[in-house]
Design a protein with these regions (language model features):
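Transmembrane beta-barrel wall of Gram-negative outer-membrane proteins
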Residues: 242, 246-273, 288-334, 356-367, ...
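Surface-exposed extracellular loop regions of Gram-negative outer-membrane beta-barrel proteins
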Residues: 522-524, 559-604, 625-645, 767-783
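Short, acidic Ser/Thr/Gly-rich low-complexity loop/linker segments typical of extracellular
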Residues: 48-64
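N-terminal periplasmic accessory domains that precede
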Residues: 99-104, 146-147, 188-190, 205, ...
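Short acidic/polar hinge/loop motifs at secondary-structure boundaries
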Residues: 68, 146, 179-207
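Short, acidic, small-residue-rich periplasmic hinge/interaction motif at the N-terminus
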Residues: 29, 43-45, 80-82, 98-140, ...
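Face-selective signature of the C-terminal outer-membrane beta-barrel domain
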Residues: 306-328, 355-528, 556, 560, ...
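Outer membrane beta-barrel strand-and-loop segments of large Gram-negative receptors
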Residues: 293, 428, 437-441, 481-488, ...
Length: 831
């Protein structure tokens, strides 16, 4: 009986005996100091396949480590750490433990220099389909926001409302970490204003994306990549910034990476106080006028949080979760004085408005990656986004009229014969905009062989916007009641389904890629008036389907020359505010509203790129042309004494241009990057009769326009002795025509200096050194000309202190030697 019990136990133990295992132990020391090194990454590699295994760990405070229960076999133990030269040890496990003893890691002076002396990193580099801008290399970026940071990117412009344009085209899509992340034209200006620049790793500009990416945005895509790194060990930074306007930033970032888990977290607080103002001059052909001038300071506080982790489940499976969110509060006021001599109109209108609002937003993402092999994988992600918050705005108007019944032959008397009549109007507007969306992506990649590559996938985006707005009016603050004709609740839904496939390859020096993307999307809108419910208002429906092909051809030529030609089809969809017929009364003399009949506009985009590199110099030439039909544009018309602005599909457009980038490195100390963008804009003539809100038929027309414009940006970085670096950025935009007028030219200069002291970094910068950032435009109508001038921000001086930490055991070499640029061609070119 006893033997019967022992026999099954022995049989059960056979598999365990067949898979005998042992522990691998060791200790890591710094070669220069002999001190133990903690949080050094220890990774196990299969010696036969040379593939990393899921088994890994990090050293303890005394430098020791243990890899437990390693099955019998031949392995390589890889020891890696920030700022150190990696080492590898061959190990064989056979029925027992193995101690590989002490490993002495030597400092990698070059790598340490890259980690700590951030001022010498390349600001800009080229990849096959995009330009990449490093934020840490931008000295003038310290203490700024994402919106301000975009102003320093070549060919990118941010106007006074925070709206972004690329190569003179405002139809640009903005992503965060490669996804839309709930950003819409309604909310992205506020969101970009609240993201601290210190949380951003890099900005990618993709002017002609392939079929793999969304076709949204005829100008291209700007991708903001937040900091997340997989360098072995733990490291982070703390940053504090103050500015001359009483604002400031505080932030903390932390990263941890081991063989099994990568994690990151960051938190930032931003406080801002900005000035702003406006000037308007409207002249009529009969000699009358309406003018205004005002100031509009604004303020805000916000908290930004991001965190995430990736679990390397096996050698072939990764599971990740990440997210970011923000809580913000803003407030401000505007004081505007209007004067007019238009017959029958008021002669003075004193307008005082106040505003405040909250921004609450979050992005949560779950991802899974499975690799069948290193060249064949699928990546699946699902993300949820929420942005919104209540806002409040009040308007007080003190209006003065000339009394038409005034008798100059009689004594002026306020009660019997007043020369002027006065009216007070009070308004309050409440809005609670909310946007919710889901993003689902599945991307399959198969490097079929050394020549051919296949990519295919699905992308779904499901969004809903709900923005109720109510307005109260009265002759005093006490008697205000709701204004039914100014109540609005706009509900907007947009569901997008997309399938794509691209096939490419490389045969010797020739590369090609061709792709096709199909998208179907359904738009559903409702605009509710006062007292109406959802069931009372029929839904406005639009169903769309379109195909978007792309073709990329590239040829590598001798002597580091590269040429590329590509074609894509893109579109610009109307966003919520452009479709909402509700009137915005924030300025009683300039009222804007949307057009629910607005249709998407489609573009065909062509680019020809050439790049030539030398050891210390580089030049890149990009010629492009974009044809757009049925383009969406703002149109303005005068009805009575009020200027109305709405949206309509008018005219066709051809944009063409050339972008020149020249990079020079002099005496190993001076980096000079110059970008010049020359573009021509042709708009066909158009005319139609417009039915105004008051029932008047107003003929509108636009002349054929052919305008040339250009912009230039120069970034100069100088590496000085004593770990000092200096940077200056100058920007100029020429005059540019619009559908009914023009935008005047403008220029600005930013400067900054940085000092590195060990793990500390001190930065002093000045944004808009000459206080010259202003937005000036002219609008022409049948019987009037209007000039507008607006500004915000102004000259701002910032001081920033930053402390970096990590598991590095020795001080870096502070010698600021430069490095020659990579001469490998267009594939990955540092600037």
């Amino acid at each position: 009986m006893k033997n019967k019990f022992i026999l099954p136990c022995c049989i059960a133990l056979l598999p365990l005996m067949a898979n005998a295992a042992g522990d691998i132990t060791g200790k890591v020391l710094n070669k220069g100091t002999g001190e133990p090194m903690d949080f050094v990454t220890i990774q196990l590699i299969n010696a036969k396949t040379n593939k990393p295994l899921s088994i890994g760990t990090a050293t303890q405070e005394d430098g020791s480590f243990i890899l437990p229960h390693v099955s019998d076999g031949e392995y390589i133990v890889k020891i890696s750490n920030i700022g150190s030269i990696d080492q590898e040890r061959p190990v064989t496990i056979h029925n027992g433990n193995v101690d590989i003893g002490e490993i002495h890691l030597a400092d990698d002076a070059k790598l340490l220099q890259e980690v700590v002396v951030e001022g010498i990193r390349s600001q800009m580099r080229f990849e096959l389909d995009r330009k990449i801008f490093s934020v840490d290399a931008n000295v003038t970026a310290a203490g700024t926001s994402a919106s301000e940071l975009l102003e320093s990117i070549p060919s990118v412009e941010v106007d006074q409302d925070g709206e972004v344009s690329l190569r003179g085209n405002s139809s640009v899509t903005i992503w965060i970490n490669g996804k839309e992340s709930g950003l819409t034209a309604d909310n992205r200006a506020q969101i970009l204003e609240q993201i601290p620049a210190e949380t951003i790793d890099r900005i990618e500009v993709i002017t002609n994306p392939s079929a793999k990416y969304s076709p949204e945005g005829t100008a291209g895509i700007i991708n903001i990549v937040l900091k997340k790194d997989r360098k072995a060990g733990y490291y982070g930074s703390a940053e504090l910034s103050v500015n001359s306007r009483g604002g400031g930033n505080a932030g903390f970032n932390f990263n941890y990476s081991s063989g099994k888990v990568d994690a990151f977290a960051g938190i930032g607080f931003r406080m801002r106080h900005n000035k702003g103002g406006s000037f308007m001059k409207r002249e009529f052909t009969d000699g009358s006028y309406t003018n205004s001038s005002g100031e509009s300071p604004n303020h805000g506080n916000n908290l930004f949080l991001r965190l995430g982790a990736t679990w390397h489940i096996t050698d072939f499976d990764d599971l990740s979760a990440s997210g970011f969110g923000m809580l913000g509060h803003r407030w401000g006021h505007s004081l505007t004085d209007y004067t007019s001599n238009v017959p029958g109109n008021w002669i003075r209108n004193y307008d005082y408005s106040r505003n405040r609002g909250d921004m609450r937003g979050a992005h949560a993402e779950l991802g899974y990656t499975h690799k069948w092999t290193e060249s064949r994988l699928i990546d699946i992600t699902a993300a949820y986004n929420h942005w919104g918050g209540p806002s409040w705005r009040s308007y007080e108007q003190d209006i003065t009229y000339e009394n038409p019944a005034f008798d100059p032959s009689l004594p002026e008397n306020d009660s019997d014969n007043p020369r002027y009549l006065f009216e007070d109007i009070y308004q309050e507007q409440n809005m609670d905009m909310g946007t919710n969306s889901w993003e689902v992506k599945a991307d399959y990649t198969n490097q079929i062989n050394e020549i051919f590559k296949l990519e295919a996938g699905y992308n779904g985006n499901f969004s809903k916007e709900d923005s109720p707005t109510e307005t109260y009016m009265g002759t005093s603050k006490e008697d205000m009641t709701i204004a039914p004709n100014l109540f609005n609740r706009f509900i907007y839904r947009n569901n997008i389904h997309a399938l794509y496939a691209t096939f490419g390859g490389k045969i010797k020096s020739f590369s090609f890629s061709a792709g096709l993307r199909s998208e179907s999307w359904q738009v559903r809108t409702r605009s509710l008036s006062y007292g109406e419910t959802i069931s009372d208002v029929p839904v406005f429906k639009k169903n769309n389907f379109a195909l978007f092909p792309s073709v990329f051809l590239s040829l590598s030529l001798p002597y580091d020359n590269e040429m590329q030609i590509n074609y894509t089809r893109r579109l610009r969809r109307p966003w919520g505010g452009q479709l909402n017929s509700f009137r915005d009364i924030s300025d009683p003399t300039n009222i804007s509203y949307g057009n629910p009949e607005l249709q998407p506009q489609y573009s065909n985009s062509f680019e020809l790129n050439y790049i030539k590199s030398w050891t210390w110099h580089m030049i890149s030439l990009s010629a492009y042309m974009r044809t757009t039909s049925n383009m969406m544009n703002r149109i303005s018309y005068l009805d009575g004494d009020v200027m109305y602005t709405t949206w309509a599909n008018v005219a066709d457009e051809i944009n063409s241009g050339c972008e020149i980038v020249v990079k020079n490195n002099f005496i190993n100390r001076i980096d000079l990057t110059t970008t010049v963008n020359l573009y021509n804009n042709h708009i066909s003539a158009w005319d139609f009769d417009f039915l105004s809100e008051n029932g008047n038929v107003i003929p509108l027309s636009g002349r054929k326009q052919n305008s040339f414009a250009w912009d230039a940006r120069m970034m100069a970085s100088v590496r000085l002795p004593w770990s000092l670096s200096f940077q200056a950025t100058g920007n100029y935009n020429s005059k540019m025509l619009s559908a009914q007028g023009s935008r005047q030219g403008g220029w600005s200069v930013d400067i900054g200096v940085r000092k590195n002291i060990g793990n500390w970094s001190l930065s002093l910068n000045c944004r808009d050194l000459f206080d010259s950032r202003k937005f000036k435009s002219t609008t022409n109508g049948p019987d009037y000309t209007q000039y507008n001038e607006r500004w915000r921000g102004g000259r701002t001086i910032r001081f920033t202190v930053k402390y970096s930490f990590g598991n590095m055991k020795s001080k870096p070499n502070k010698k600021g030697d430069g490095e020659p640029m990579d001469g490998s061609g267009y594939g990955d070119m540092d600037m």
